[in-house]
Every structure is written in structure tokens, then in C-alpha cells.
């Protein structure tokens, strides 16, 4: 089996369908004997350039190990699913399991926000005393 990195972008109006799509695609990979090394839902993000007059899309990243037949089936599903506006499947040499830079940046933003909120509540509590 070979390793692949799969990124697909979903129409922003169809964002509520993304969890079902992820479940369907991961189910197809695992039932065929493949493994999923990394799965990241990056959420809605600004596009670098408009695609079909859209300026945002919902991004999903998957790193999988699977047979070529499964990848061909996924590619066919992407092609005939109108909600998927772009996809990219790249073969990689090794399984990638660490967190991607996009997800790291998102985590850091959440950590900073939590720290700021804690500081605000501590300051508010100390000013009340």
C-alpha cells in the first residue's frame, strides 16, 4: 500500500455535509484495508482566488495509506460530487502523522484567546476586590 495526502475543498453552502462526507470517505478507505494517519478539518477559509464566483471554501486534509483502487474510487467520488469544488491527491513517500502548519496556527490562536480570557477574568476579579 502507498501513502497519499488528500486535500479537498467543499462549497461553503454545503459545510454542514462535511462530517458525513468525511465519514463516507474514511469508511471507504478503512473497509478496503487502508489506514488513516491524519485527518484535519480546517474549516472555512478564504480562497487565494475566486472559484466559480466563490471566495471561501471548507478545507479537509487527509493522510492515508491505501491501495490504488481505493484512491481511484475516491477520485471518482470527488469528481461526481457537486459539493467538492477542488481536490488534490498526492502520493507521498512516508506516512505523515504530525499536525500540519495550518492546524498548528489554529491551535495557537485558540490558546492565545484562552490565555487572554483568563487574564481578563483575573484582572476583573482583582479589580472587584
UniProtKB/Swiss-Prot annotation:
InterPro entries: Ribosomal_bS6 (IPR000529), Ribosomal_bS6_sf (IPR035980), Ribosomal_S6_plastid/chlpt (IPR020814), Transl_elong_EF1B/ribsomal_bS6 (IPR014717). Residues 110-121 have a biased composition (Basic and acidic residues). It comes from Aeromonas salmonicida (strain A449). One of its GO terms (cellular component) is cytosolic small ribosomal subunit. GO terms for molecular function: small ribosomal subunit rRNA binding; structural constituent of ribosome. Keywords: Ribonucleoprotein, Ribosomal protein, RNA-binding, rRNA-binding. This is Small ribosomal subunit protein bS6. Binds together with bS18 to 16S ribosomal RNA.
Amino acid at each position: 500500500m502507498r501513502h497519499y495526502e488528500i486535500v479537498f475543498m467543499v462549497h461553503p453552502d454545503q459545510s454542514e455535509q462535511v462530517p458525513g462526507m468525511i465519514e463516507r470517505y474514511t469508511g471507504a478507505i478503512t473497509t478496503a484495508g487502508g489506514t488513516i494517519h491524519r485527518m484535519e478539518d480546517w474549516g472555512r477559509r478564504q480562497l487565494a482566488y475566486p472559484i466559480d464566483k466563490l471566495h471561501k471554501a471548507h478545507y479537509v486534509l487527509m493522510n492515508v495509506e491505501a491501495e490504488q483502487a481505493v484512491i481511484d474510487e475516491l477520485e471518482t467520488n470527488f469528481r461526481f460530487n457537486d459539493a467538492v469544488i477542488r481536490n488534490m491527491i498526492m502520493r507521498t513517500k512516508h506516512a505523515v502523522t504530525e499536525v500540519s502548519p495550518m492546524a498548528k496556527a489554529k491551535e495557537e490562536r485558540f490558546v492565545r484567546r484562552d490565555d487572554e480570557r483568563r487574564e481578563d477574568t483575573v484582572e476583573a476579579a482583582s479589580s472587584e476586590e
